[in-house]
């Protein structure tokens, strides 16, 4: 039996797959169950979906919380029940009065901390049921606005002749890009719906390095695992430390606190953004844990 894959795979999610579909197919390709994704992408959306395998599933929540980047194509003058063009058209409006400057200013007005009302067609649960399940039954319930942050919007193209615009968006966890498109259209007074969505980046994972499921399967058949990112490479902001003796090695194996003098530097000297947290390696140089300095002891944050 092949050795278990431990690390993060930068999957290119193709249109038509749910995030759960990707995980299910990867379980078949890798022949292992311990796999988890790091944040849902709509079935119609494409792009970066980091998938954690084996021991790396312990960092899933750390990746889910990070900012993400997208490229979205939005259609002006149309309002749908799903806030994207896959939904039922509820209303169409004339956009002939919209100018390029007005559209550009409206788009940029959403940069910063904003409040978003989640769409009915979303996986948010209310009373134990997902909103999209209620929406499919023709029900609409009140949703509370949620705070999200739009860090940047770069307008890539405005095509008023065809009633569309393309933008690159960097945003916080929990941001709905189709809701952003909808809200831009609403503020303009003409409506808008998202037409295409590509997730371009999550942390260090970029779309041009992402692999499709077919490409991953081919690599695995060739016994090539070079595309699997080891967990410690996610945390380059933390210094690397190695156990200094057998006593420290035993402490590490058990996840016990380790005194400062029992860890030695594993790195070339350089400045780190965060010195209180360290990556700890065993006597064989294998990454085993993230520890945090509290007083005179390093205490475990996460074991791997």
Predicted features and spans:
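Catalytic cores of RNA-modifying enzymes
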Residues: 1-172, 183-211
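Accessory RNA 3′-end/elbow-binding domains used by RNA modification enzymes
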Residues: 1-14, 20-37, 41, 45, ...
């Amino acid at each position: 039996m092949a050795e278990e894959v431990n690390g993060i795979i930068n999957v290119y999610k193709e249109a038509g797959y749910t995030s759960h579909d990707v995980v299910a197919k990867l379980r078949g390709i890798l022949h292992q169950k311990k796999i988890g994704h790091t944040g849902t992408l709509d079935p119609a959306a494409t792009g970066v979906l980091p998938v954690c395998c084996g021991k790396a599933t312990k960092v899933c929540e750390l990746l889910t919380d990070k900012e993400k980047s997208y490229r979205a194509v939005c259609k002006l003058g149309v309002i749908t029940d799903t806030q994207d063009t896959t939904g039922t058209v509820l209303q169409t409006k004339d956009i002939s009065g919209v100018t390029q400057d007005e559209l550009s200013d409206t788009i940029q007005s959403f940069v910063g901390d904003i409040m978003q009302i989640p769409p009915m067609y979303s996986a948010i649960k209310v009373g134990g049921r997902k909103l999209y399940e209620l929406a499919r039954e023709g029900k609409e319930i009140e949703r509370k606005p949620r705070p999200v942050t739009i860090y940047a919007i770069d307008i890539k193209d405005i095509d008023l002749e065809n009633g569309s615009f393309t933008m690159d968006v960097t945003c916080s966890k929990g941001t709905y890009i189709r809701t952003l498109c909808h809200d831009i259209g609403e503020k303009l007074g003409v409506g808008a719906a998202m037409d295409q969505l590509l997730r371009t980046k999550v942390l260090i994972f970029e779309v041009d390095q992402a692999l499709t499921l077919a490409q991953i399967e081919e690599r695995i058949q060739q016994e090539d695992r070079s595309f699997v990112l080891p967990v410690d490479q996610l945390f380059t902001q933390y210094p690397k430390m190695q156990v200094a003796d057998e006593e420290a090695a035993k402490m590490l194996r058990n996840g016990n606190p380790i005194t400062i003098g029992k860890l030695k530097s594993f790195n070339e000297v350089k400045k780190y953004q965060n010195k209180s947290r360290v990556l700890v390696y065993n006597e064989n140089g294998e990454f085993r844990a993230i520890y945090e300095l509290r007083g005179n002891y390093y205490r475990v944050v996460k074991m791997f």
